[in-house]
Amino acid sequence: MKALFLLLSGKESPEKFRIGLRAAARSVAAKRYDDLKIVFFGPSEELIGELKDEDLQNFESLFKAGAIDSACIAEAQHYNVEEKLKNKGVVLGHAGERIAFYVNSGYTVISF
């Protein structure tokens, strides 16, 4: 099975964001899926530039593993976090296109 983790939660629910990031990192480390990709969308994009401790470690391990696909450029502009995302190495693209690509490629969407 292939999974797309769609991280949507932000400052309104940071624990939900952390759970998604942690679950993704543990899933990649344990090779639970044939493939796992992450798309950050909306409020979650604000948190990426503020990551620390376990969250930062999880993000970095996912980045090194190639699991992080992208963040939505329109939402990055809306939240004024384009530079923070680019500084973390996150590719900016159109989330709708990326989600459609993964769904059409047989990935199951899991959202946090």
Task: Locate predicted features.
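Short, glycine-rich nucleotide/cofactor-binding loops
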Residues: 4-20, 43-51
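C-terminal binding/interaction regions
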Residues: 105-111
